Amino acid sequence: MSEKDLGGGKKAGFIARTWRGFWRWSARLLVAFLILSLVLVATVSVINPPTWAWRIDRALFPPKEDIQVRHQWVPLDKIAAHMQLAVIAAEDQRFTLHNGVDFAAIKTAIADRDPGEPLRGASTLTQQTAKNLFLWSSRSFVRKGLEAWFALLLDTLSGKRRTLELYLNIVEFGPGIYGVEAASRYYFNKGAGKLSTREAALLAALLPNPWSYRINPPTAYMNRRADWIARQMRQLGMATLKDLD
């Protein structure tokens, strides 16, 4: 056997060992990620998180300076049923029907998307909760994929009621205003359990853009949006909340 053949054999062996090492470490990283994600979701299923990814991101990269952070955790049964229904009506009317990811909505959003435009309108309430809890804010296909994975885990391990409780306690209702209890006290000077239907609709109307929208006093646009949410609430009906169990 010539030196050329020996050299070629050594090179091929090195490449084979490199690929084996690559796949071995990739498998280990995947297993570690799966275990970590299961632990994270299982933890927030039973323990109220002291902080979360979205809040940390805002603290590190605040859109504005000198923001006073307001937050107070409140259990779901202390949140007005109107408020629970309002966020479902505003953000995810199929919340009780899907398993965390609404594949029918994704299919529709893809069909309606203009070429070159990002995918919009397909994130479920569960996906929003997963993003706020665990992921970064910038949009990418990687983040959307992770968001879907965590949403499926949340729906499976936490269930609808706990997911809704998490969402209502960590979602941002204004600069530094986290959770419905802090929002209710800031905007209406009352606890979340005493919100009226109109007040709940106004708070839910903030959710797409809480840093830009205002409800104190509400603009004409916000009144129209709250009116639309109230109509959707009537169509869904309070019986929707029974399907959370």
UniProtKB/Swiss-Prot annotation:
**Superkingdom of the source?**
Bacteria
Q: What is its EC number?
A: 2.4.99.28
Q: Name one GO biological process term.
A: peptidoglycan biosynthetic process
Membrane topology, from the record: Single-pass membrane protein
Q: In which pathway does it act?
A: Cell wall biogenesis; peptidoglycan biosynthesis
Concerning InterPro entries, the annotation shows: Glyco_trans_51, Lysozyme-like_dom_sf, PBP_transglycosylase, Pep_trsgly
Localization, per the record, is: Cell inner membrane
Answer whether the UniProt record assigns the keyword Transmembrane to this protein. yes
Catalysed reactions, as listed in the record: [GlcNAc-(1->4)-Mur2Ac(oyl-L-Ala-gamma-D-Glu-L-Lys-D-Ala-D-Ala)](n)-di-trans,octa-cis-undecaprenyl diphosphate + beta-D-GlcNAc-(1->4)-Mur2Ac(oyl-L-Ala-gamma-D-Glu-L-Lys-D-Ala-D-Ala)-di-trans,octa-cis-undecaprenyl diphosphate = [GlcNAc-(1->4)-Mur2Ac(oyl-L-Ala-gamma-D-Glu-L-Lys-D-Ala-D-Ala)](n+1)-di-trans,octa-cis-undecaprenyl diphosphate + di-trans,octa-cis-undecaprenyl diphosphate + H(+)
Q: Does the keyword Cell inner membrane apply?
A: yes
Q: Which GO terms describe its molecular function?
A: pentosyltransferase activity; peptidoglycan glycosyltransferase activity
Q: Which UniProt keywords apply?
A: Cell inner membrane, Cell membrane, Cell shape, Cell wall biogenesis/degradation, Glycosyltransferase, Membrane, Peptidoglycan synthesis, Transferase, Transmembrane, Transmembrane helix
Q: Which residues cross the membrane?
A: 29-49
Gene3D superfamilies (UniProt xref): Biosynthetic peptidoglycan transglycosylase-like
* GO CC aspect terms: peptidoglycan-based cell wall; plasma membrane
The family note in this entry says: Belongs to the glycosyltransferase 51 family.
Give the protein's function: Peptidoglycan polymerase that catalyzes glycan chain elongation from lipid-linked precursors.
What is the official name of this protein in its record? Answer: Biosynthetic peptidoglycan transglycosylase
